[in-house]
């Protein structure tokens, strides 16, 4: 795992610059981040992604 330190308004770039993650603010133990990615790239919070994956796994296969 790559660990980076960023301040408010600083960003990191993923891949060839198509995905940008920006720190928007820090308040207590919460960090607000913004993700700029192409429409074809799904961006989810981890708990939402896991719920979607679980629902797909539970679908009957034909």
From Swiss-Prot:
- One Pfam family of this chain: CsrA
Record's subcellular location: Cytoplasm
The UniProt disruption phenotype note reads: Increased expression of aprA (usually repressed by this protein). Partially suppresses a gacA deletion mutant. Double csrA1-csrA2 deletion mutants fully suppress the requirement for GacA/GacS in control of its regulon. Decreased expression and stability of RsmY and RsmZ sRNAs.
An example Gene Ontology biological process: regulation of carbohydrate metabolic process
Annotated keywords:
Activator, Cytoplasm, Repressor, RNA-binding, Translation regulation
Q: What induces it?
A: Active throughout the cell cycle. Expressed during exponential and stationary phases; more protein expressed in stationary phase (at protein level). Under partial control of the GacA/GacS two-component regulatory system.
Q: Which residues form a coiled coil?
A: none
- Superkingdom of source: Bacteria
- UniProt GO molecular function: mRNA 5'-UTR binding
One CC-aspect GO term: cytosol
Give a short account of what the protein does.
A translational regulator that binds mRNA to regulate translation initiation and/or mRNA stability. Post-transcriptionally represses the expression of genes controlled by GacA/GacS. Represses expression of hcnA; alterations in the ribosome-binding site relieve the repression. Binds specifically to small RNAs (sRNA) RsmX, RsmZ and RsmY; these sRNAs fold into secondary structures with multiple GGA sequence in loops to which the CsrA proteins bind.
How is this protein organized at the quaternary level? Answer: Homodimer; the beta-strands of each monomer intercalate to form a hydrophobic core, while the alpha-helices form wings that extend away from the core.
What is the similarity comment for this entry? Answer: Belongs to the CsrA/RsmA family.
Q: Which HAMAP family match?
A: CsrA (MF_00167)
Q: What PANTHER family does the entry give?
A: CARBON STORAGE REGULATOR (PTHR34984:SF1)
Protein name, entry field: Translational regulator CsrA2
Q: Which organism is it from?
A: Pseudomonas protegens (strain DSM 19095 / LMG 27888 / CFBP 6595 / CHA0)
């Amino acid at each position: 795992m790559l660990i980076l330190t960023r301040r408010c308004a600083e960003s990191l770039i993923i891949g060839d610059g198509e995905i940008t993650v920006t720190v928007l603010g820090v308040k207590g133990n919460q960090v607000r981040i913004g993700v700029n990615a192409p429409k074809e790239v799904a961006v989810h919070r981890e708990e939402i992604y896991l719920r979607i994956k679980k629902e797909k796994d539970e679908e009957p296969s034909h």
